[in-house]
Amino acid sequence: TLESSSAASDVYKRQMLHRALFGSLERFIGILIENYAGKFPFWISPLQTVVIPISVDFEEYAKKVSNKIREAGITSMVDLKNHNLNYKIRDHSLAKIPLLIICGKKEVDSNSVTIRRLDSNKQENMELNSFLKKFSALNKAPSNI
């Protein structure tokens, strides 16, 4: 509350209303987006993984993998669009998805996944349970924040 006085020495109490277009949470999110240029750390990314089947023959396995990923507390979706593999990889890379999970015959036969990280063009094959254990640990927020 502000106080002001008149020429007759009367004291008036004034109130000021403050209104901001964005609150502190919105400003914080804006700073995060600007700082990371959309490439969020894995633990804070809104969509952490996209599972991409190589063809329609592997869609069931891709759905199974995505469900297991979600059960481990990692956000995931399956890309079932009717596009070729390179288009899907490019599309999700531009969307800055941290991990792309590729599923094909080799992965189905060995109960594994092929991982492609956003910051690398290299692909890594991992057994599914090892993948879940490793990335569940990465999904926890750092304790030094």
Model region roles, listed by residue range:
Residues 1-8, 12:
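Single conserved hydrophobic/aromatic residue that forms the stacking wall/gate
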Residues 15-32:
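Conserved phosphate/anionic-ligand binding catalytic regions in large, soluble enzymes, centered on
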Residues 36-90:
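Generic long, charged, amphipathic alpha-helical segments
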Residues 96:
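A short alpha->beta transition loop at the rim of the catalytic pocket in nucleotide-sugar-dependent
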Residues 107-123:
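Amphipathic beta-strand/beta-sheet edge segments enriched in Tyr/Trp
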